[in-house]
Amino acid sequence: NLMSQPRTREILTKTTVDHMAIIKKYTSGRQEKNPALRMKWMMAMKYPITADKRIMEMIPERNEQGQTLWSKTNDAGSDRVMVSSLAVTWWNRNGPTTSTIHYPKVYKTYFEKVERLKHGTFGPVHFRNQVKIRRRVDVNPGHADLSAKEAQDVIMEVVFPNEVGARILTSESQLDNNKREEEELQDCKIAPLMVAYMLERELVRKTRFLPVAGGTSSVYIEVLHLTQGTCWEQMYTPGGEVRNDDVDQSLIIAARNIVRRATVSADPLASLLEMCHSTQIGGIRMVDILRQNPTEEQAVDICKAAMGLRISSSFSFGGFTFKRTSGSSVKKEEEVLTGNLQTLKIRVHEGYEEFTMVGRRATAILRKATRRLIQLIVSGRDEQSIAEAIIVAMVFSQEDCMIKAVRGDLNFVNRANQRLNPMHQLLRHFQKDAKVLFQNWGIELIDNVMGMIGILPDMTPSTEMSLRGVRVSKMGVDEYSSTERVVVSIDRFLRVRDQRGNVLLSPEEVSETQGTEKLTITYSSSMMWEINGPESVLVNTYQWIIRNWETVKIQWSQDPTMLYNKMEFEPFQSLIPKAVRGQYSGFVRTLFQQMRDVLGTFDTVQIIKLLPFTAAPPEQSRMQFSSLTVNVRGSGMRILVRGNSPVFNYNKATKRLTVLGKDAGALTEDPDEGTAGVESAVLRGFLILGKEDKRYGPALSINELSNLAKGEKANVLIGQGDVVLVMKRKRDSSIL
């Protein structure tokens, strides 16, 4: 009894309550409070471990030194055996071995991490103040970006294939991953639960909200503890890249290119969707990546909105992500006069609001009232980045002194030559030159506040004065941490609005930064051919004609107008000098009409070569051309109407077409009896002889032709109800 011993009696009766809390802490609950101590104390005992009875058959009672490895006495309250810690040593040295073949496969992410670190290079350590801001980052390099639910199904399928519960793997990525894992993990002896944990690392993106200064891709985040402290940073170059970072990077580039291209087309939204659906990134459909990838970037979010996916509720202005943290406002249209007396119609936000602003190189906290900046606290990597943030905040505040600081007219246009909206007009104006804005803003005396200093109109720091309401802080402003996604709508011009009608994103917000994608981006849409310049347009146009020759051929003879209006010929028009587009088009269309009228002069090579020139609205003129000019390689190059040129070269011997020296595909042409180079085949393996000839019976459908013998003639119905007489060729051959 504790009360009978004087010392314990004293503790239990006289201890103050706060000490009682400590006693309680160490004596209550099932959670071990001091694991290290507990471990030392346990290991000091003779038999600290219990094991299943089968251990007695697998391990001798004594080791080579004669020390006892297990005791016959049962563990109190169970039928397990008491085992010495020496038994573990014996097992490690003499126990059964197992195949290690599956370890690198199951622990793939760890093995890969070791390789990346082995080949990584660590540079010097710099001591300086680190402006870290919390960002949502990917902490798991080398994952496949499946959703948690999708991954769970794959894991169950691989690890417990015979379990009950129907799981249907639907998405392409699920099936690919499942097949690969099942092949790699045949006869695997590693505990299923371990395999499941490791598979999860391979399949799912794990994000954490961490303080970061510097690189945010997952191969940097995995060494965050080695590369940045509170007052130091260690330079580091990863020893390898991982696909998930490459996907994120390439997705942003593809999305930016697509949004930029869509903006200038007649129907931006329809074009954007067409391009998203026909683009592949690293061999995976872009729309599949968009559905799974949580990357938040303006262009990516516009593409997601177009697909009807939810996106973050923050909005973008001047390349900064704004998140309202308190307050509210109503919008009213107001007319204001610039310093140049130009009238602008702006939507004024009336009311007090607070925002966080997060950009790539600077962050800020902004407090504003109606057309008035109350306070702006900025932090950034350098003077330039801080200035960018200040300009954006000043424009966003809609203050009168900002509008009055405009010198000259505002007439900025977007890629499609449409005027920008007034807020973006102002932004572009001051991004070009903000001197007057800063000069007119006004300055004030400042109090000495820890961690804050002033900034003067010339962007130099000061401890006495500062731009009115503006301060520079040593501390960064954290990115908005919530992963909440909202339903949005998108209009024809790619403006994305939330359900209250606030504009969250527009093409003006898409960065003009050009980068080189890490993964191959394949834009199948003809709208993207011009992304790699005029040469690519030329090659792609001709490749497209050759790939689709079967249908092009029939349209050429049946419904040329529809063929001439194909969007695939649109990019090509930019290569033809403006002044002659209409003349060329009229000339080639007339030439083609003559070919159709005079049966038997169907020249495949010539049709392919001249077809792209028919897309412009034709001008009727008597002009004849022996060559047509296209602007490539910085100058006009000629395509000969009859014959080869460096631009368009058809080699009869190899039957291959080269465009500007690049292979554009094979033309398996078949110049028939006698008329070399003259083609009159519209149907593969048949020669068109002329108009319908009743002597050869009723018109057959194209499918019925297969029964004809070589050299036999028949009438056949093609295209829009026209009937022509054809003959089955005497040699087996095909045109293309």
UniProtKB/Swiss-Prot annotation:
One of its GO terms (cellular component) is virion component. SUPFAM superfamilies: PB2 C-terminal domain-like. A motif (Nuclear localization signal) lies at residues 728-731. GO terms for biological process: 7-methylguanosine mRNA capping; cap snatching; DNA-templated transcription; symbiont-mediated suppression of host cytoplasmic pattern recognition receptor signaling pathway via inhibition of MAVS activity; symbiont-mediated suppression of host gene expression; symbiont-mediated suppression of host mRNA transcription via inhibition of RNA polymerase II activity. It is found in: Virion; Host nucleus; Host mitochondrion. It comes from the Viruses. Keywords: Cap snatching, Eukaryotic host gene expression shutoff by virus, Eukaryotic host transcription shutoff by virus, Host gene expression shutoff by virus, Host mitochondrion, Host nucleus, Host-virus interaction, Inhibition of host innate immune response by virus, Inhibition of host MAVS by virus, Inhibition of host RLR pathway by virus, Inhibition of host RNA polymerase II by virus, mRNA capping, mRNA processing, Viral immunoevasion, Viral transcription, Virion. GO terms for molecular function: RNA binding. Plays an essential role in transcription initiation and cap-stealing mechanism, in which cellular capped pre-mRNAs are used to generate primers for viral transcription. Binds the cap of the target pre-RNA which is subsequently cleaved after 10-13 nucleotides by PA. Plays a role in the initiation of the viral genome replication and modulates the activity of the ribonucleoprotein (RNP) complex. In addition, participates in the inhibition of type I interferon induction through interaction with the host mitochondrial antiviral signaling protein MAVS. Belongs to the influenza viruses PB2 family. Influenza RNA polymerase is composed of three subunits: PB1, PB2 and PA. Interacts (via N-terminus) with PB1 (via C-terminus). Interacts with nucleoprotein NP (via N-terminus). Interacts (via N-terminus) with host MAVS (via N-terminus); this interaction inhibits host innate immune response. This is Polymerase basic protein 2. It comes from Influenza A virus (strain A/Guinea fowl/Hong Kong/38/2002 H5N1 genotype X0). The gene is PB2.
